[in-house]
Amino acid sequence: MEAKMNKIDTNVVELEIKVDAKDFNEALKKSYNKNSKKFNIPGFRKGKVPMNMVKKFYGVEVLFDDAINACIDKTYGVALEENNVRPVDYPQIEVVEVGEGKDLVYKAKVTTYPEVTLGDYKGLEVEEVSYEVKEEDIEKQLADMQARNARVETKEEGTVENGNIAVIDFKGFIDDVAFEGGEGKDYPLEIGSGSFIDNFEEQLVGLKVGESKDVNVTFPEAYGKEDLNGKPAKFEVTVKEIKVKELPALDDEFAKEVSEFDTLEELKADLKEKAVKANELRAKREMEEKVINAVVDNAKVEIPEAMINREVENMVRDLEMRLGQQGLSLEQYYEFTGSTEDKMKSYMKENAERKVKTDLVMSAVTEAEAIEATEEELKAKAEEVAKMYSNGAETEKMVDLLLNAQRAALELDVKREKTLKMLFESLK
């Protein structure tokens, strides 16, 4: 086998590969053996037709396709390796010369991984990010805990007020015609929650139990249903019951009921400690994003369209999987959002291109710094992942499984973490 490489465009090369006539003839014999049962010639049992008779009656060309494919399978990978070519997609194959007793010559047009030209990535200046935990943040968390533990009681007298729960029957109309999904019975609506469209909830304030009212609203332009988007609607609403939330007192008894702490002060201290840690993690992630963005923006790389398209397909599959976990399909998603597959892919393309560039640039930094993952680091990462999904004896089994089946992914994670650490340590 011989292979010559020509660069024909940015990130595109053409390999001209020659397979020796002897090897091609061997491939023809294997093609004959593989397909022998398909040939029917009078005077011969099925599967017993000699090769020379097959060539006479059908022509030797009938054996070419399988023989050519076998030769390509055997030689294409070798040609890539010999010429240090990293493909990002399947090649475009063109057979140049083929014939019995002749060399097989074919061309493979290959889109390759792009070369990354790194800019400055060490000694960068990035504005530090930090978040303060304020007293009102803790008070809000306590208020949320109060609301979750509130007792709901029937309001015997009075009218609907903000913060009340109105139990309602409703039926919606557009142009005096009832629409699908616009009707509800005994629906508990918390006034002021913003869970209904427009100013629906505000219009119920002041109503008594048993009273009815026509509530006029307008659906948002991007509501998600073509027949409702931007349309004015009327809802016939009847208040059947009014409920109020009785919030528990914020005291030591409350702390004992909702946590493992004996006093309210201990509970508040715990909430603050957790908030500080959450803010530190948030700040760290934002700093990481800033550093990565700076490194990526300083680099230059021409990304092949094939890589972007592949990432878009990955994003679509990821969305489909997440929707499936919620019992939804892509088709339902398109209907709810008023989108289409083409629109969604077009929307995803910019993010896909950025992700591909980020991965390429960060890998180039890792390579430039000769950063490697040691066996100890791989095992530590495997243990970290395993502990998220198992415990005890099962953890050790999962560690072994990860080290064998997901070694490349673990290595990528470790290298990325070490690369980020190096970038942070070099910040001015």
Swiss-Prot record:
It catalyses: [protein]-peptidylproline (omega=180) = [protein]-peptidylproline (omega=0). One of its GO terms (cellular component) is cytoplasm. GO terms for biological process: 'de novo' cotranslational protein folding; cell division; chaperone-mediated protein folding; protein transport; protein unfolding. The keyword Cell cycle applies. Belongs to the FKBP-type PPIase family. Tig subfamily. This is Trigger factor. The lineage of its organism: Bacteria, Bacillati, Bacillota, Clostridia, Eubacteriales. PANTHER family: TRIGGER FACTOR CHAPERONE AND PEPTIDYL-PROLYL CIS/TRANS ISOMERASE, TRIGGER FACTOR-LIKE PROTEIN TIG, CHLOROPLASTIC. It is found in: Cytoplasm. The keyword Protein transport does not apply. Coiled coil: none annotated. Its EC number is 5.2.1.8. Residues 163-248 form the PPIase FKBP-type domain. It comes from Clostridium perfringens (strain 13 / Type A). The gene is tig. Disulfide bonds: none annotated. Involved in protein export. Acts as a chaperone by maintaining the newly synthesized protein in an open conformation. Functions as a peptidyl-prolyl cis-trans isomerase. GO terms for molecular function: peptidyl-prolyl cis-trans isomerase activity; protein folding chaperone; ribosome binding. Keywords: Cell cycle, Cell division, Chaperone, Cytoplasm, Isomerase, Rotamase. Pfam families: FKBP_C, Trigger_C, Trigger_N.
